[in-house]
Amino acid sequence: MSNCINDDTVYMMDFKGLENILIDMDGVLLDTEYDNYFWQKHIPLKYAELKSIDTDQAIKITHTLFNFKKGNKDWYDLDYWSNMLGLDVEKEKLSDDMINRIKLKKGAIKFLDKYHNDKNLYLVTNAHRKTLNIKMQKFPLMNYFKMLICSHELRHVKEEIPFWFILRNKLGIDYNKSILIEDTIDNVKSAYHAGLRSILIGDSLNYKDMPCFNDLSSFSSSLK
């Protein structure tokens, strides 16, 4: 059972003095079904066709490669995987079947509408720029944000502590007046070491030592 705070829980967060909201994309604004299906099912099927092998063998090969790179910048790099697998990964992501799987999470637009005028919103994602562009074609959220940051371009991923120091310098913001909204605990932990507070979003999370909400809708309803 999740310990995330829900709409029925009395929880108020004071936004007084808060200037900057750093927001993750996948798992916070967008549902992760698109990415999960793409890497776990779609790419193995295409790899099986390319190599003329059975699907189970293709799944074993591709998932082994993915797991080996998980947590570093290659894992998010479409060009890396195109070269590694011999597939045009960007083209596969642009197929109609895949584009139709990109979906907004509950409360995403309402949250952005509510805060983009009086707070500095920054999209901070591990997604490759090509992946970000594909998703922004489906849901053009760019104008809500002061800047769209892809970790790959800072040569570190969000799981790595140096990323957050480099990001702070790039944005020129005070982390004491900022908050991160994330769905990945490893990213929250690394951000903490740079002095950045976080809110966890996710219906399966189970952390008692920090604010945790099922989605942006329940988080927004808790704010003063």
Regions found by a protein language model. Name each.
Residues 21, 89-103, 108-139, 151:
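Substrate-recognition element of Asp-dependent hydrolases with the DxDx(T/V) motif
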Residues 31, 123-125, 200:
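Hydrophobic residues in well-ordered beta-strands that form the structural core
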Residues 51, 115-119, 194:
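Helix C-cap/helix->beta junction micro-motif
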Residues 2-21, 113, 128-129, 133-224:
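Asp-based, Mg2+/Mn2+-dependent phosphohydrolase catalytic module
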Residues 4, 8-110:
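N-terminal helical cap/lid subdomain that shapes the substrate entry/recognition surface
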